[in-house]
Every structure is written in structure tokens, then in C-alpha cells.
């Protein structure tokens, strides 16, 4: 009798647990189709599940997301008027309390579970997707490649200088030992044993890159991509997924991009423009400066200050030398933070924010009237911003492409 009672009790418990699981699933797991109303006009019907960022992309509405949907960049903002659930803690570091009350959400964090009514920026409807072909993918510095893509014939990416595109990568496995890297850069790669790394990605990924090309360079998109290797103090950390993929690309390979996006645009004034860059932050600097001089024929005073580690890390030197020779309103300067003995360097040395201050802004009659455009590693950006604040430069004249943020 006790055995039979035990079996009955066990069966009842199993049935209760099964019913609880089914009930929880009905509440937590979405099934069937839902409808998303966009900007009060367009209605999208789609299967429930996934995140709003991806769901909109599947319908051809590409919301900018520099981090590819990881919740770290804070750029994929939409307004959720109804549906979408409560705002998540991961969103609150990017969205103020006032914005949250107005329905602002990060689309990469919003679950598609119920019908929704949302608002997106009108400019996203001008965003398109292209399958491009790799023209070249050459080292410009030890850890920076210039990826040059051909846009499909008859197509055009209508971007503004300082804008960016998003690049997609399929699931892949990339071995660093297979990278095509010129001999002149092997010293550092050998020193840090970077050839050992392998990047394995099981799902499609998306990342944003500022363009080094400017609008008059028709038919191509140029990017400067720094390889994201594990830091020396954490050698077991995984390497950067997208940068590893991009570094593996070869001429003829197909690459999917979407865009254009951006907000790091030049102001339409006559103020002096001071560009400050470092590392792969060269990309939007080149785009802006070429656009101002070659396309707009700007008469504004323009200076460019670039920080590099050694002479080996300098690139586009001939391009900027030619601009300086052709346009009397443009000058450019490089500061090396760690020049090598063989560099025989007699130019500026030290960190770029100090060099800009000592050699340009210290005795400038009105630095607060200049416009400052910067892009570089986070520590460079922070140092430059502090220096500018100390000089009395207002926020509205400090424009930052924060690719490291």
C-alpha cells in the first residue's frame, strides 16, 4: 500500500511540475504573430520572439547600433509607446529617467513578445543594405588595416563625411596565423605571439565603423580597422570578433554592409577647425578633412594633429602632405609617443593632447572659438576633452566620434 501511495504522490508531483512549466512557458515564451506599428503609419506583422533591433532589421528598417546589439553603445534608441515591457537595468546607463518616462528604449534590449506601437527616427528609412566586394585589405600600421570595398555597380552609399556604416559577419572561424601581414610588422606580432589566436563566432554579428573615404570617392567605401587583440595582462581573453573577421578578408570576398548612419558631422560655420586623432581614429579625420578641402573647397583654417607610437604607425602621410601643399589654409602635425631609434625623428614627441596645447592652443588668441573634432582611443579623448574644458571650450564646440565608448 505504501509503495502504491508513493507512486501516486510521485505522479501527482510530476504532473503539477509539468503544469507549472507549461503555465510559465505560456507567459514567458511568445508564440504566434505580433504586429508592430511604426511611426503611426506602417504596420509590420512578424513572428514573436527575439529582439526589436533584429526584428526591424528583418523588415528592412536598420536602427544604428555601433556595438551590434550588445547594449553597450546606447545608439539603437526608439520610442516604445505601448508594448515592450518595462525598461531593463541594462538600458538605464544610457537612458535618463526623463527619457524613460517618455518611452525611450534601446531596441536591442526590447523583447518582441506582444503587439507594439513605436517611433523611430525618420532618417532610418533612408538606410539600405549592400553586398560589396573587397578590393584590397592592406596593413597601414602594425595593428591597422585599410579595408577598401567596391559598392555594387550603379549603386551609391549617400553618406556624409564623418558618417559610418555597419558591417555584418556570418558565423566563422579565423586563425591569426593565416593573416596576410607584411614582414615589416612581424616584430610586434612575434613579440606578443599574436599568431596563436583563433576567433570562433557561432552567430552572425554586426559592428559599426567610421568611413575613411569621403563622398567624392565614388563607388568605394574605405575603413580603418584596428585588430582587437587580447590585452597583454589578459592573454587568455578572446580576440575581437569583428576585427578578426575583417582582417581575414581577401580581395574578391563578399561583405554585407548597411547604412549610412552618423551624427559626427561638421558644423556649417566659418570657425577654425582643429582635428585631433590617434590610431584607427584616423578614419573620420581623413573623411572630414578631404571633404572640407577637396569637395567643399573650404577657406576655413584647418589643422590636424595626429598621435602615433612610432614612425611605423604613421599612415596617409603622402595624402596629407599633398593637401598641405595644395591648400594654404591647412597644416598637419604628427606627435610620436615612443619613437624608435631608427626613426631618426625630429618632430613632435609626447602625447597628442600636450603637443596640441603647447604648440597651438597655449598662445591661441581664442581657443574657445574653435571647433574641435576628435577620434581616438578613450584615454586620448578623455585627455583632450579635459584640456579643452580647462581652456574654456564649450561642449557645443567639442565633437567626438567615440568609437572606443
From Swiss-Prot:
<keyword id="KW-0472">Membrane</keyword>
<keyword id="KW-0411">Iron-sulfur</keyword>
<keyword id="KW-1003">Cell membrane</keyword>
<dbReference type="InterPro" id="IPR001433">
    <property type="entry name" value="OxRdtase_FAD/NAD-bd"/>
</dbReference>
<dbReference type="GO" id="GO:0006814">
    <property type="term" value="P:sodium ion transport"/>
</dbReference>
<feature type="region of interest" description="Catalytic">
    <location>
        <begin position="270"/>
        <end position="387"/>
    </location>
</feature>
<dbReference type="GO" id="GO:0005886">
    <property type="term" value="C:plasma membrane"/>
</dbReference>
<dbReference type="InterPro" id="IPR001041">
    <property type="entry name" value="2Fe-2S_ferredoxin-type"/>
</dbReference>
<feature type="binding site">
    <location>
        <position position="73"/>
    </location>
    <ligand>
        <name>[2Fe-2S] cluster</name>
    </ligand>
</feature>
<dbReference type="Pfam" id="PF00970">
    <property type="entry name" value="FAD_binding_6"/>
</dbReference>
<dbReference type="InterPro" id="IPR017927">
    <property type="entry name" value="FAD-bd_FR_type"/>
</dbReference>
<keyword id="KW-0408">Iron</keyword>
<dbReference type="Pfam" id="PF00111">
    <property type="entry name" value="Fer2"/>
</dbReference>
<dbReference type="GO" id="GO:0046872">
    <property type="term" value="F:metal ion binding"/>
</dbReference>
<feature type="transmembrane region" description="Helical">
    <location>
        <begin position="3"/>
        <end position="23"/>
    </location>
</feature>
<dbReference type="GO" id="GO:0016655">
    <property type="term" value="F:oxidoreductase activity, acting on NAD(P)H, quinone or similar compound as acceptor"/>
</dbReference>
<dbReference type="InterPro" id="IPR008333">
    <property type="entry name" value="Cbr1-like_FAD-bd_dom"/>
</dbReference>
<feature type="binding site">
    <location>
        <position position="108"/>
    </location>
    <ligand>
        <name>[2Fe-2S] cluster</name>
    </ligand>
</feature>
<protein>
    <recommendedName>
        <fullName>Na(+)-translocating NADH-quinone reductase subunit F</fullName>
        <ecNumber>7.2.1.1</ecNumber>
    </recommendedName>
</protein>
<keyword id="KW-0997">Cell inner membrane</keyword>
<feature type="domain" description="FAD-binding FR-type">
    <location>
        <begin position="127"/>
        <end position="267"/>
    </location>
</feature>
<keyword id="KW-0915">Sodium</keyword>
<dbReference type="InterPro" id="IPR039261">
    <property type="entry name" value="FNR_nucleotide-bd"/>
</dbReference>
<feature type="binding site">
    <location>
        <position position="76"/>
    </location>
    <ligand>
        <name>[2Fe-2S] cluster</name>
    </ligand>
</feature>
<feature type="domain" description="2Fe-2S ferredoxin-type">
    <location>
        <begin position="32"/>
        <end position="124"/>
    </location>
</feature>
<dbReference type="InterPro" id="IPR012675">
    <property type="entry name" value="Beta-grasp_dom_sf"/>
</dbReference>
<keyword id="KW-1278">Translocase</keyword>
<comment type="similarity">
    <text>Belongs to the NqrF family.</text>
</comment>
<keyword id="KW-0001">2Fe-2S</keyword>
<keyword id="KW-0813">Transport</keyword>
<dbReference type="InterPro" id="IPR017938">
    <property type="entry name" value="Riboflavin_synthase-like_b-brl"/>
</dbReference>
<dbReference type="GO" id="GO:0009055">
    <property type="term" value="F:electron transfer activity"/>
</dbReference>
<comment type="function">
    <text>NQR complex catalyzes the reduction of ubiquinone-1 to ubiquinol by two successive reactions, coupled with the transport of Na(+) ions from the cytoplasm to the periplasm. The first step is catalyzed by NqrF, which accepts electrons from NADH and reduces ubiquinone-1 to ubisemiquinone by a one-electron transfer pathway.</text>
</comment>
<dbReference type="InterPro" id="IPR010205">
    <property type="entry name" value="NqrF"/>
</dbReference>
<dbReference type="Pfam" id="PF00175">
    <property type="entry name" value="NAD_binding_1"/>
</dbReference>
<keyword id="KW-0520">NAD</keyword>
<keyword id="KW-0406">Ion transport</keyword>
<dbReference type="GO" id="GO:0051537">
    <property type="term" value="F:2 iron, 2 sulfur cluster binding"/>
</dbReference>
<keyword id="KW-0812">Transmembrane</keyword>
<comment type="subunit">
    <text>Composed of six subunits; NqrA, NqrB, NqrC, NqrD, NqrE and NqrF.</text>
</comment>
<keyword id="KW-0285">Flavoprotein</keyword>
<feature type="binding site">
    <location>
        <position position="67"/>
    </location>
    <ligand>
        <name>[2Fe-2S] cluster</name>
    </ligand>
</feature>
